[in-house]
């Protein structure tokens, strides 16, 4: 499962890239979405790679994001009780592990918003004009996306 975080704004962005961002529901900076690893999303991520950070998320980071930034309709927080009542899982951690392993999806939680509005990273970005290979934040982080998401929790 990919975690995709928008790092750059929408000024002077080509229409096709902005359209792909809309399809991914990345309308604003510091918004994060989770998408499955399949050829359709891989192509979309490849198209917007110069404006986002992405990588494979692990279960602990997903659980942390669900606890801190998970919101339901009406802007209420996602709680352990809500997960227990509305899914087959006992905790947010167990649900996050199931999502990462592909046993369930985020859509199985009713009224869960698909976009996580993150905080800007604590201690700042490494740079939003350069790729990870050049010492910045843009592009494919691989497993390193978990460190960025922890900074943005």
From Swiss-Prot:
SUPFAM superfamilies: Ribosomal protein L30p/L7e. InterPro entries: Ribo_uL30_ferredoxin-like_sf, Ribosomal_uL30, Ribosomal_uL30_arc, Ribosomal_uL30_CS, Ribosomal_uL30_euk_arc, Ribosomal_uL30_ferredoxin-like. It comes from the Archaea. PROSITE patterns: RIBOSOMAL_L30. It holds the Pfam family Ribosomal_L30. One of its GO terms (molecular function) is RNA binding. Part of the 50S ribosomal subunit. Belongs to the universal ribosomal protein uL30 family. PANTHER family: 60S RIBOSOMAL PROTEIN L7, LARGE RIBOSOMAL SUBUNIT PROTEIN UL30. This is Large ribosomal subunit protein uL30. The lineage of its organism: Archaea, Methanobacteriati, Methanobacteriota, Stenosarchaea group, Methanomicrobia. The gene is rpl30.
């Amino acid at each position: 499962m990919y975690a995709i975080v928008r790092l750059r704004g929408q000024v002077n962005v080509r229409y096709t890239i902005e359209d792909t961002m809309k399809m991914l529901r990345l309308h604003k900076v510091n918004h994060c979405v989770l998408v499955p690893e399949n050829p359709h999303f891989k192509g979309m991520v490849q198209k917007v790679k110069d404006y986002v950070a992405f990588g494979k998320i692990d279960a602990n980071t997903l659980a942390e994001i669900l606890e801190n930034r998970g919101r339901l309709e009406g802007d209420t927080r996602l709680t352990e009780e809500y997960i227990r009542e509305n899914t087959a899982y006992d905790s947010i951690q167990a649900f996050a592990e199931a999502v990462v392993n592909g046993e369930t999806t985020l859509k199985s939680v009713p009224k869960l918003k698909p976009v996580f509005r993150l905080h800007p990273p604590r201690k700042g970005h490494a740079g939003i004009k350069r790729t990870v290979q050049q010492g910045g934040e843009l592009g494919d982080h691989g497993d390193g996306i978990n460190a960025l998401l922890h900074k943005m929790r």
